[in-house]
Amino acid sequence: MRVVYERCAGLDVHKKTVVACRITPHPDGGWRKEVRTFATLTDELLNLADWLRASEVTHIAMESTGVYWKPLYNLLEAEFGVVLVNAQHIKFVPGRKTDVNDAQWIAELLQHGLLKASYIPPVEQRDLRDLLRYRTSLIQERTREVNRVQKVLEDANIKLSSVASNVLGVSGREMLEQLIAGQDDPVQLAQLARGRLREKIDQLERALTGRMRASHRLLLKLHLEHIDDLNAKITYLSAEVERLFVPFDDLQAIERLDAIPGVNPTIAQTILAELGKEMERFPTAAHAASWAGLAPGRHESAGRNRSSRIRQGNKHLKTALVQAAHAAGRRKDHYLGAQYRRLAARRGKQRAAIAVAHELGVSETAIR
């Protein structure tokens, strides 16, 4: 079999250890295969790099095992050609002998060019991804915390959400603070309304008539404090993301994406961070949508094509595009809104959102 890399190595990565197998030419012909085990502490990983460097290894392959591959990749990527491989791909490559350990098998597959490398973005893009994904998790946690506030109010029979569109708006927040402080007079609470909400004073007085207990006040206090803390962290992260985006990509790209129905600046940032600038790795815009997990599987049998479950993809990009699709579905002045409503009536909102998200994925890739 043709040899692609004469000096290469395979790494079997675990939480506490890394088993490495390096393959180099033997002076008498054939190949020398050496196996060593290293701990995953930084000094041991540096020893691993020295060991590979001593034999002039040029390329290394390893499986994408959890998050354990990341420290190794960060340490080795500057000096070696590192190939990160999906474990499922290695599993289904035929020809493995039962007495060959994982590291040696990975090294042999790499030596003959039989591994398909996963795409790993540059470190700047990886940093952006980490920050944006954490910001998304904080936003989701804030939503859960707001729902907990609603649950406490319902338990106390305070129907503020039936009158105020935003319970945590300026008026709603002041009312909640007074409830926490012990104020239970609905007339006094309703007078805290501002703006257009003052037109609903009578409704507010009825909605704010409930039965607040000490436990309700304590829970509301803790929930609001948590929401304030989350808001501060989200604001801080957003400012840091804006700073990191300046060298990563021009602001015009965000503006172009922001012009697409359903896409706001936050979603545009997620799309750029997940897809990156190297769009040439996608032959077509449809390939990018498929990478996001927005293309249905297709099986052909007896000359007939059958759709199957949507393939797994980048869940963070998919979530952002589906969120944009739901927003686009509310548009009355765009064909995507009409498409969403038509599909939702026949097949449900979730399937409609997936279909529109696919359209958005194709559009966003095409304008890059």
Annotated model-derived regions:
Residues 1-368:
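A detector of single, family-specific signature residues
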